[in-house]
Amino acid sequence: MNQARSPFAQAVLERNFPEDQISSTGVTAIDGTPILDAVVEIAKNWCVPITQSASKSLSKASTEIQSADLIITAEDLQSDVIRNLGYHGALRSYEEIVEDRDFVPIDPVGLLPDAMSRELGKVGALTLRAALDAKGFPHAHNIHVVIPHGVSDLGVALAHAQMARIDEGAILIDADLRAPIVNEIEDLGLERIFFDVDQIGILETEHVNTQQILTHPRQVDFPERYFLSPSWRNWIQQLANQAPVVIITAPRHSRARRLADSYLASYMADEFTVISA
């Protein structure tokens, strides 16, 4: 319908790759239908402002479709429609980008704000992953992400991440900017080394040892705006050129709501582990 997922994906790509020409359309879109107000508001809070004011039909977007270097669709069936239009270029569907099915976003139209945010987070993550797969994301060492399914899984997930980082000789990062880990870090006897997400990339990390963890010193509102910024991806790439990286994300579910953070913090990973105790 080109009212939620696709205009949001367009905004994410425009922020991350401003040199590219980005547009969006919908397989069943009707020209001129307004983008959903809730999507516009979420995108504003996440610093990826929606630039398309209304939906665009396939017929109106035919020129852009045929000249595109890459087309990203939400579903495999939509990819079939694009191929049937005669497009022969690179084509990726959210359904085939990563094996973890929980990453695949459903259409958020009609969802409550928290659920809509979570689905748009998935859209942002998979859109960026598809773009990186096409453009390249070179890094010398493995990026391994550990994702707690819920808050109750956090302790086990951190212990798993710590074992993985010891095995790999990796830098360990607490990527929960919304509620940085405290008690579980203390329980494992790890030393916290603070990074500031507003000055990301400045911290010297060459001497981070296997008993230390990079973590944020304070809670951050709307952490999605940082994960959707090129600076987060570039910092992880910088670290992964020094040593292997293990990232532990926020839980997919807090006690009160579903979160987008884990998807957005991890889209560039080579390896995913979801912990559900």
Model regions and ranges:
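Conserved active-site segments centered on acidic
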Residues: 1-68
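C-terminal boundary of histidine-terminating zinc-finger modules
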Residues: 111-132, 136-143, 147-149
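Phosphate-binding loop that captures ATP/GTP phosphates
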Residues: 124-136, 140, 160-218, 225-226, ...
